[in-house]
Every structure is written in structure tokens, then in C-alpha cells.
Amino acid sequence: ITANYTGGDIGVFLLDAAGKLQAEIQYIAFEGRTPERVAHVHCMIPTPDGKYVLATDLGNDHIYRFRYNQEAPQGSVVLTDQQIAYQVSDGQGPRHLIFSKDGRFAYLINELGGECVVLSYHKGKIKEVQRLMADEGQGGGSADIHISPDGRFLYTSHRLKKDGISIFAIDPKRGTLKKVGYQLTGIHPRNFAITPNGKYLLVACRDDNKIQVFQRNATTGTLTDTSQYISVDKPTCIIFAK
């Protein structure tokens, strides 16, 4: 399932046994709320129970929910029952969404407004629990969001002003966040990834042409610049293979 930002649409493709893309079996186009506000679908993510798929629409300030039909015959429609699951505050621009390790909470980073929103999740329904400012520079360029492998800390990246990573401790019972630090990075940290062992956090600094390596303190969640980096032309995404 792909989110297409510029077109404001979703594509669903079949995969063969080797994981190669096959035919597109479903196409869903979104309309803008007004002629000036066009749809920009930025992220698609399945819910932990596997029953739904959520989509963030940065242009319309919506999170949409689709029912996912796992039993659909091969080649038939799999996403149905489109609904607005959460209305984001106007102008916030929802970008990326991630679920907690236990699946009870979702965390949203808003690109334009710079807020991080904590949402509870239960049987296809999401409700707002907490909102707090994550972008210290308030540059309108918040980008990525990830949770540490142990589920104790959440990180968000921010561009355009005071480029860096916000660090939050996660309350294990309530899912709420507490700010514990902010780590400056190279220019335009569009994306980042935490190593599977949780020891390092790698930042794709697009306009510095490098992947910056930070050591992560498992106890405090804070980051330390190792002064090591990997030279890459305009890096935009880091994913660890499983």
C-alpha cells in the first residue's frame, strides 16, 4: 500500500512470492477541503490488530481510517469503509504516524505546526490524549518519528530552523510524553532510524550529504554525537533490513 503525496492518492499493489510488485488492484483519490487546500497523503500504516489501515493527509489535516479485508480474494479490493478517524487542528499538517510497542497508543508528528500528538487506539477508534510542541525551532518542517526498541523513548526530527532531534520519555501506562532533551544535527534531518540493538541513532542529513551517527543512552534516551558519518548524496530515508 503506497501513499502518494503529490497526487493525493493511495495505491494498493499485489506482491508475488519473491516480494516483487505486481499489478495495482486498488486506487483511491482524495479531494481537497477547498480549492486552495489539496490532498497530500503522506503516510499509510496498518493498525496493530491488522484490521484497519490509517492514512495521514497533510493537506486536509485528517487521519483517515480504512477497513482492511485480509480475506479478500486475490486481486480484489482490500480497503473499504473510508472514515475520518481524527481531525487534526487546522494548519498542523499531519505527516508520520507510529504505534507504541503494545499497540495501545499512536504517536503523530505534524509537519507544519511542529506538534507531537499522543492518540489512544482501541478497536479501530483513536482519541487524543496529549498534544505538545516538539519542534523547538518552530520552522514548519517536522519530519520523522520513531520509538526506541525497548519502547521507552520517542524521537522526532525537525528541519528548516534549529535542525535536530527532540527526545521524549514515554509513560508506559498512560502513553504520555515528557520532553527530556533536544539534539542538534546536520542540515535538514529528513529521516532517521534507530539500530535494532538500540545503541545508535542514524540521521539522514539531506543537505549535508551525510548520514550522521549518534550514540544513544538506553537509560536516559539522550544522544551523543560520535563525530562519525557516512557520506551519501542527498540521503532521504534509512531502513534496516530484517
Predicted feature residues:
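Short loop/turn segments immediately following beta-strands, especially the blade-tip
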Residues: F13-Q22, R67-V77, L119-I126, F168-G175, ...
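Conserved beta-strand positions in repeat-built beta-propeller and related beta-rich domains
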Residues: T2-Y5, A55-L58, S100, L108-L112, ...
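Beta-propeller fold detector
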Residues: Q22-F30, G75-Y86, K127-A134, L177-L184, ...
